[in-house]
């Protein structure tokens, strides 16, 4: 596994290229024909960077922690680097599984702990490149009724996951709001299991920027003020000021290199 990771990282150094391009979404128009959930997600991925995600090396910081992601064809390597004093902890999730290293030394973990770390690493990387990832095999998409938020019309898509391939948190449920004109992802909500029951979050995208042709956003992260909310209705609850700002999800120092085939 260690040699596999080193080979991938070395390959990136020799095969990356910079392309200072941006995505032109001005020609995207609304469609009179009925679009499916897959159609909407595909168009959203396209205006967010499309196939470039599949051949990319990303670096960013989130809450003073370093993250790196390498995607090349059907191979991937997702890394979290925790730095303290002179020590560095590397959490690595790839096609072959999860591993942790303390500097250069492999750390053997109990399965339950390893799964917790794996889910944590995967979650940050998952949100960082949305809507990319919504066409994974374990994803199930359902088109809900259109909705208007703050005067803009949105397609609304619900996402669930198969247990097989859906990860540790396969029972989580997501709802995504895509602008009907640009197909960009502006809002999302999700439910998750916690000790006290079902938790919910709603996120509002802001600070859109394209880095080497890939779209990145930050999020205002909201929680419900009380119990009894319905996940699919959080867009309206947000518009009616029924949600409370909990935190901000900000990706800093984002770098993108595109990889040659």
Tell me what each language-model feature is.
Residues 34, 38, 47, 51, ...:
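Intrinsically disordered terminal and processing segments
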Residues 12-15:
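C-terminal motif of bacterial Sec signal peptides marking the signal peptidase cleavage site
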């Amino acid at each position: 596994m260690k040699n596999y990771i080193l080979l991938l990282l070395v390959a990136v150094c020799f095969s990356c290229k910079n392309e200072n391009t941006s995505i032109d979404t001005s020609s995207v128009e609304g469609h009179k024909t009925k679009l499916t959930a897959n159609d909407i997600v595909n168009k959203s991925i396209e205006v967010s960077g499309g196939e470039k995600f599949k051949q990319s090396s990303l670096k960013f910081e989130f809450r003073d922690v370093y993250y790196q992601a390498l995607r090349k064809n059907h191979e991937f390597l997702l890394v979290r680097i925790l730095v303290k004093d002179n020590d560095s902890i590397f959490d690595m999730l790839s096609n072959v599984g999860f591993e942790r290293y303390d500097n250069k030394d492999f750390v053997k973990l109990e399965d339950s702990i390893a799964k917790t770390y794996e889910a944590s690493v995967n979650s940050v990387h998952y949100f960082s490149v949305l809507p990319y990832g919504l066409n994974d095999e374990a994803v199930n998409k359902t088109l809900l009724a259109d909705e208007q938020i703050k005067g803009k019309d949105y397609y609304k898509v619900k996402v669930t996951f198969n247990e097989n391939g859906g990860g540790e948190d396969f029972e989580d449920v997501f709802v995504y709001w895509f602008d009907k004109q640009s197909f960009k992802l502006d809002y999302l909500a999700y439910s998750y299991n916690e000790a006290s029951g079902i938790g919910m979050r709603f996120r509002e995208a802001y600070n859109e920027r394209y880095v080497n042709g890939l779209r990145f956003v930050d999020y205002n992260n909201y929680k419900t003020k009380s119990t009894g909310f319905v996940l699919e209705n959080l867009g309206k609850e947000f518009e009616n000021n029924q949600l409370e700002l909990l935190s901000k999800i900000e990706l800093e120092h984002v770098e993108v290199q595109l990889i040659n085939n």
